[in-house]
């Protein structure tokens, strides 16, 4: 039993000893006391659940029930019956505060489990044991759609500057360049059950915060003895420390409580850069599977640029940027050039999720010219079949140990690449953006791309099921592809399904698009946020809605929250200048419902946002990565 002060309530201690009114335990019987605690409850979606408490103490006793530490309006009796439950109410937490004129006492926190026979089709998530309330990977699911469809508390109708705002900041020991992750209903060694927010810093630390109270549950530093994070060298656009840059991934089926997989960069006292893959217990932060494991790889890399040369992975030359992916029992990571070093090549590697041992590697080099395979912070995308996808501006050759070279022509431009993960790693198909755009744009080689968005199965008006992928290029294009037939046949790419030109700015893109309700969203620097409708496997050639504001030089990182198919909110974080969090009605982007500049006296201002991390929305709160921690937003009391 916990006794603690709760905001808005006073906790009073009575010294009954001096009054001769104590019971045999030395406790004043007039103080409120709980004799029968509420218990964990399981109920089906579409029904209700009831929690009950029995308390003693001097009358009158007052009751106030809480959900996720927020008081429930009208829930002021010894029992509380929920509203009709939805699947997204699964793993909700409740407690009751009992008060009289002498003091207050909290009940144990109890868990509501909601069962359902329905299957979500909102994403192509291949993570094991994923709960609708969870956010276990970069951009919310394996397909990188950016959709969190288990949000019941935040809707366009209740988001405004009066009711919603900044709640506080979770402090970390370095810049946070990874997306915060969220696991609901984590059982802790103490026996408590908590919703937990995970954050990783560039100083090489992983944090588990109580998502309700903000308390640190555990912190694990991944620096070895006499080690420090690596640095950014001469780069001015990257953090001075480089410890953990790629968003981790969580598998709730691994280990005693679940595992969070992390890649950390360190540098020893001699200046040698070391990269390791870790698996940490999500409840304790302890290393799992005899980890960590040193990252090493080699490949045969004979091609027109680097003829007959053997390639060994050099941790000092390659940086893990893309969010980690979990497919077919393997953790996948992509390594791009570190601050311009080795700018002609990159790597994809996989690690066994049960042992952390190497499970395959692929070295990617340009077939011709200087362009390197482009990885942004957007994670490697995956579909339900376990295939991986990359969308980036580059020219490629692919090499795996013992395999024949597969060369992609030098005109690849914005290339979609498909990789099989069934037996190691293999490039199996690809396509490239149409060259019908302006020649100066196609040949510039200076733009970045969004990463690939894997669209959930889409049925057209004729009943045909399409397996689509989307990508926005920094050259001002948006592409729609059929993942089943990208077009590589005899090394001659064929046109993709659709390329839209002129509807997005020709500028850098650092994050994926987002997708909700047959609508794709783009948020490119120098452009409004735009929505494009998907019909008959084609996007509308003009936006169906767009924001009134134009984005700055860094564009915006976007996510969508919804309660299944309703209540969609598009969230955007801008990092140009002071950080700004914005919220829009996802069905009409011209309807902006909130932003952090609206409140007086800088009430909702937060430390500078980082440039490539989308916001995480879970449990009625929004978490934004910053240069000093995680800014937390939610309903104000």
Predicted regions and their residues:
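Hydrophobic beta-strand segments within extracellular beta-sandwich modules
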Residues: 63, 94-95
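Surface-exposed, flexible coil segments in extracellular/virion-facing regions
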Residues: 66-84
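A short beta-strand segment in extracellular, disulfide-stabilized domains
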Residues: 47-55
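Bacterial Sec-dependent N-terminal signal peptides
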Residues: 16-35, 116-129
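Solvent-exposed loop segments of extracellular immunoglobulin-like
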Residues: 57-64
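Mobile, glycine-rich extracellular loop/lid and propeptide segments
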Residues: 125-460, 464-489, 509-532, 555-562, ...
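Surface-exposed, proline-enriched loop/turn segments that connect beta strands in immunoglobulin-like
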Residues: 36-40
């Amino acid at each position: 039993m916990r006794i603690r002060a709760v905001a808005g309530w006073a906790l009073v201690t009575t010294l009954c000893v001096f009054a001769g009114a104590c019971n045999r335990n030395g406790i004043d019987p007039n103080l409120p006391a709980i004799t029968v605690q509420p218990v964990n409850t399981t109920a089906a979606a579409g029904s209700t659940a009831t929690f009950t408490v029995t308390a003693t103490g001097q009358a009158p006793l007052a009751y106030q029930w809480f959900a996720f530490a927020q008081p429930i309006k009208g829930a002021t009796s010894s029992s509380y019956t929920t509203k009709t439950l939805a699947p997204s109410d699964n793993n909700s937490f409740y407690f009751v505060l009992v008060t009289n004129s002498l003091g207050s006492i909290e009940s144990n926190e109890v868990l509501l489990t909601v069962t359902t026979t329905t299957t979500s089709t909102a994403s192509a998530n291949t993570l094991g044991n994923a709960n609708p309330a969870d956010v276990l990977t970069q951009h919310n699911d394996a397909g990188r759609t950016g959709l969190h469809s288990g949000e019941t508390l935040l809707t366009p109708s209740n988001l405004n500057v009066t009711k919603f705002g900044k709640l506080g900041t979770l402090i970390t020991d370095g810049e946070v360049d990874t997306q915060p992750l969220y696991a609901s209903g984590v059982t802790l060694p103490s026996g408590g059950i908590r919703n937990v927010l995970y954050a990783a810093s560039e100083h090489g630390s992983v944090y588990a915060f109580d998502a309700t109270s903000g308390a640190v549950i555990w912190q694990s530093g991944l620096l070895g003895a006499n080690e420090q994070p690596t640095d950014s060298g001469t780069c001015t656009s990257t953090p001075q420390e480089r410890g953990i840059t790629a968003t981790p991934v969580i598998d709730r089926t691994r280990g005693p409580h679940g595992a969070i997989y992390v890649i950390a960069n360190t540098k020893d006292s001699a200046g040698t850069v070391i990269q390791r893959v870790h698996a940490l217990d999500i409840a304790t932060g302890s290393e799992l599977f005899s980890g960590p494991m040193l990252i090493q790889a080699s490949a045969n890399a004979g091609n027109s640029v680097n003829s007959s040369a053997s390639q060994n992975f050099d941790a000092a030359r390659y940086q893990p940027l893309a969010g980690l992916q979990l497919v077919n029992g393997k953790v996948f990571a992509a390594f791009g050039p570190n601050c311009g070093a080795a700018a002609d090549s990159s790597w994809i590697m996989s690690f066994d999720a049960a042992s952390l041992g190497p499970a395959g590697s692929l070295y990617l080099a340009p077939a011709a010219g200087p362009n390197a395979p482009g990885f942004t912070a957007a994670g490697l995308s995956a579909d339900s079949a376990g295939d991986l996808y990359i969308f980036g501006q580059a020219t490629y050759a692919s090499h795996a140990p013992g395999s024949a070279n597969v060369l992609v022509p030098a005109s690849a431009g914005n290339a979609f690449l498909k990789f099989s993960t069934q037996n190691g790693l293999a490039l199996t198909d690809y396509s490239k953006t149409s060259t019908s755009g302006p020649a100066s744009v196609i040949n510039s080689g200076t733009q970045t791309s969004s990463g690939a968005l894997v669209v959930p199965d889409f049925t057209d008006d004729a009943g045909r099921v399409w397996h689509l992928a989307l990508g926005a290029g920094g050259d001002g294009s948006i592409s729609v592809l059929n993942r089943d037939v990208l077009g590589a046949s005899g090394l001659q790419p064929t046109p993709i399904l659709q390329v839209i030109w002129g509807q997005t700015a020709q500028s850098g893109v650092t994050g994926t698009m987002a997708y909700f309700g047959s609508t794709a969203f783009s948020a490119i620097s120098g452009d409004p946020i735009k929505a494009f409708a998907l019909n008959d496997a084609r996007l509308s050639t003009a936006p169906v809605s767009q924001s009134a504001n134009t984005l700055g030089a860094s564009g915006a990182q976007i996510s969508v929250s919804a309660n299944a198919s309703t209540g969609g909110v598009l969230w955007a974080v801008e990092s140009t200048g002071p950080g700004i969090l914005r919220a829009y009605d996802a069905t009409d982007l011209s309807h902006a419902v909130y932003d952090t500049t609206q409140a007086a006296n800088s009430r909702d201002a937060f430390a500078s946002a980082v440039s490539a991390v989308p916001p995480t929305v879970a449990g009625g709160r929004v978490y934004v990565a910053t240069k000093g921690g995680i800014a937390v937003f939610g309903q104000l009391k």
